[in-house]
């Protein structure tokens, strides 16, 4: 189907008129309520009675006033912009012959917007526009809308009228502001440049109806030269090129630029507009930058003011018709603002209304609908329904724990709530090299890549460790007074790990209950047990046989009761008879511990042996992540004292057998297996019989280098652990500030390998301290958690 050379309904422009309409700066407009400021050459007193706006034609030396004279024929048009592609210009237009000058001008190059002058397509006589203005102003050409005052227009609303029936011109269909003659005698050429914006007959376009299903692309077109703001100042005078459409059912996108501007607007890039559009019947809001025409979508602004959606349809002025190339009938709908789609209220007269013009693109799913679908899929799902879980499980099967220290740039953690006990624990874990390397080994997935997850704890700590990067090369230490070395530290920007805080709610931990004491040791157990359980569930994907042992696995499991020990037969697969020193035998029971990378870092075992008269010893192995040290006794002043008290033999009072006979029973705890990272918990919070809780503020001395005595180990492993396997070095201390057990504050000191020194981190505050300040007693703070690493792994 051949398309003829289009004509603009404005006709031909002389150079002066072109500069007047497209180049000269526009006047400012005072929108209602009218402030009395003179916006043009007409004085305020010249306004008609009841008229709220001053009719101003930008760049023209006179004000066009409304007249109640002639009624406009339906073929006339009113436009609020000089944009020749505006959809308001859908009307008949006479076709004028090209003159040799016009043809020569088409071949020249326009210096206004650096595009070929043929793209401007200004082919009519130079006096057509002036005659139109004169006829309109003299004959009351503002038309039936203005005469009946059914619709109020803001300043700058133009009246360019053209009688489509003059001089026997054939009807023309306007395609994006270009009048294309459909007559057989009209002159034109078949140019693919003008075929890009053709509309199909199955979807006729109307100017004022935003209710049809439409597509919206919110991102501006890359490298597109047209303005990003959708103001009335964006005058377009070109068309996309290099796109031929043979089937109107398929979208046709330009290969070069979608729109070209005739005038470079100074504020084109300002992020000041708020655009509303409709996609598939949904209201979409794009804040900031204007929406570009892309994927077959164009946006046009209509600066109409005071549109009343509550008026009956019959009283609304008819919309201008669009004659499609295939002869589709015109559709007339009342003008509506975007605000009317939300509620029946008048839109602000100062806000431009953005309309969307579709180009037959396939329907794009609504982003709002996609978000709802995303919300349905988000959250916790079983491991079997998580497609990423199997990948993480395979990685964890092959992971090798790395204990090499890493120099990380310290970053504070913003505390907007009562999260100091969490922040202090997180800083200690970040300073733990094997923990850092483990989480960095697991890939970081975004919400888009993994909307639903079966491992929220792992995901959050992988994200946390990725917040920290290698520290830049520190400056050389500078000498200060007294030959004291002063080191500088440049911490990174503080951040708020909200995704870590949300874990308390996601996993429904008892720590999230209101009124509970916020305890750093309890939170550490929550983290390590949570990571361990998630890794166990991943192991089940590869080895389902682990499932039957998962209940009794991990430090969270309790010691088997003595009655249960008696009921267990000697042939149980979980027990065996062990021969100790001096040929003493004992029955040892142990759960089938499934190892995970977390137990490989923090997991140790303690042996609890029960001694009973005239009976074999009964031993139970129990895993731990933190070693609980009772410091309540007055004899305990150091960590070594607390460790010796841990392994001391104690009597169990009131123990009876099945025959109701009271027997003497004692119990002793020893260390069966020492972990690479040993966390000591100084139990400062003791519960009274009355139900209250008090804090032990006594000072407990702790060394930087800690050696675990052989006497603390179980008999079977005493000779298997060399001194290097029993020696630890301090790398983090979590302090509790205050004398109350129901409140206070938590801070952390961590060893920084890059500085070869210590840092004190109080939420988002980071400062350098010396080692003496770490171990020195203080009245306002007491050590609560001690983090040690084995020296043979340093």
Swiss-Prot record:
Domain USP: 411-791
Phosphoserine modification, residue list: 209, 224, 316, 332, 361, 366, 543, 572
EC number of the protein: 3.4.19.12
GO cellular component, one term: cytoplasm
Cross-referenced Pfam families: PAM2 (PF07145), UCH (PF00443)
Record CDD domains: Peptidase_C19 (cd02257)
Changes after translation: Phosphorylated by ATM following DNA damage, leading to stabilization and translocation it to the nucleus.
GO biological process: autophagy; cellular response to interleukin-1; DNA damage response; DNA damage response, signal transduction by p53 class mediator; DNA repair; monoubiquitinated protein deubiquitination; negative regulation of canonical NF-kappaB signal transduction; negative regulation of stress granule assembly
Keywords noted in UniProt: Acetylation, Autophagy, Cytoplasm, DNA damage, DNA repair, Endosome, Hydrolase, Nucleus, Phosphoprotein, Protease, Thiol protease, Ubl conjugation, Ubl conjugation pathway
Function per UniProt: Hydrolase that can remove conjugated ubiquitin from target proteins such as p53/TP53, RPS2/us5, RPS3/us3, RPS10/eS10, BECN1, SNX3 and CFTR. Acts as an essential regulator of p53/TP53 stability: in unstressed cells, specifically deubiquitinates p53/TP53 in the cytoplasm, leading to counteract MDM2 action and stabilize p53/TP53. Following DNA damage, translocates to the nucleus and deubiquitinates p53/TP53, leading to regulate the p53/TP53-dependent DNA damage response.
Quaternary structure, from the entry: Found in a deubiquitination complex with TANK, USP10 and ZC3H12A; this complex inhibits genotoxic stress- or interleukin-1-beta (IL1B)-mediated NF-kappa-B activation by promoting IKBKG or TRAF6 deubiquitination. Interacts with IKBKG; this interaction increases in response to DNA damage. Interacts with TANK; this interaction increases in response to DNA damage. Interacts with TRAF6; this interaction increases in response to DNA damage. Interacts with ZC3H12A; this interaction increases in response to DNA damage.
Protein name in the entry: Ubiquitin carboxyl-terminal hydrolase 10
